[in-house]
């Protein structure tokens, strides 16, 4: 499953294709959205924001297209007027004079006003996004120590989008390896220096993954700058302590860690 860095890179590609250009054709499959087709034609996409796995496509007239890919949704960039052959069902088409972005198969799609965005049930549930560059380590540390999260085991907390949006399994295990913590630890147990290190890693590792354009299934995920230290490396030696990396299951997901140096 894609995590925050992959979702943000997908949004970047969509932005690069149509941002700032007048929309010449807007099409929605769902009847309740079709009244917006004429209204949005001629407007521009100002930017595309991400909140976890949700994309918010903002239009110059003030409306926002909310879409969540869930399990099957996928965006494509094509030349204007092109209709690719696909077994998927087309849900959204936003086209400019030169390019079009197409959303297939997703079912969680809506057009929202600014007030509706602020009160959307999913967006109210998710925490701040780790790729929001205004989010600071100090704010993350405060969330770690909050009554809501301080007594949660990290194995589950780091998968909970209500804590921080954009984290997933590979980020979970890499972050915990980086700071030498096991998945069963809790923020309430940590020293101040451990909390500082964790708060920084929760932002630094996702942002490095995003910047370096890595691939999830490639061991050299972060190119020359960063390699997976534990993810999909069970049975190999830990580069920090020489122990053997193990694979177990925590919070119903595969969990990779080094018992020798993660405590």
UniProtKB/Swiss-Prot annotation:
Residue positions binding DNA: 70, 125, 169
Catalytic activity: 2'-deoxyribonucleotide-(2'-deoxyribose 5'-phosphate)-2'-deoxyribonucleotide-DNA = a 3'-end 2'-deoxyribonucleotide-(2,3-dehydro-2,3-deoxyribose 5'-phosphate)-DNA + a 5'-end 5'-phospho-2'-deoxyribonucleoside-DNA + H(+)
Gene Ontology molecular function: any one: class I DNA-(apurinic or apyrimidinic site) endonuclease activity
E.C. number: 3.2.2.-, 4.2.99.18
Any one GO BP annotation for this protein: base-excision repair
Zinc finger extent (FPG-type): 229-263
InterPro entries listed in its UniProt record: DNA_glyclase/AP_lyase_DNA-bd, DNA_glyclase_Znf_dom_DNA_BS, EcNei-like_N, Endonuclease-VIII, FPG_cat, MutM-like_N-ter, Ribosomal_uS13-like_H2TH, Znf_DNA_glyclase/AP_lyase
Cofactor annotation comment: Binds 1 zinc ion per subunit.
Record-linked PROSITE patterns: FPG_CAT, ZF_FPG_1, ZF_FPG_2
Cofactor(s) essential for the protein: Zn(2+)
SMART domains: Fapy_DNA_glyco, H2TH
Active site, UniProt feature: 2 (schiff-base intermediate with dna), 3 (proton donor), 53 (proton donor), 253 (proton donor)
Keywords: DNA damage, DNA repair, DNA-binding, Glycosidase, Hydrolase, Lyase, Metal-binding, Multifunctional enzyme, Zinc, Zinc-finger
Pfam families on file: Fapy_DNA_glyco, H2TH, zf-FPG_IleRS
HAMAP family, sorted: Endonuclease_8
PANTHER family per UniProt: ENDONUCLEASE 8
General function of this protein: Involved in base excision repair of DNA damaged by oxidation or by mutagenic agents. Acts as a DNA glycosylase that recognizes and removes damaged bases. Has a preference for oxidized pyrimidines, such as thymine glycol, 5,6-dihydrouracil and 5,6-dihydrothymine. Has AP (apurinic/apyrimidinic) lyase activity and introduces nicks in the DNA strand. Cleaves the DNA backbone by beta-delta elimination to generate a single-strand break at the site of the removed base with both 3'- and 5'-phosphates.
Family that this chain belongs to: Belongs to the FPG family.
Protein name: Endonuclease 8
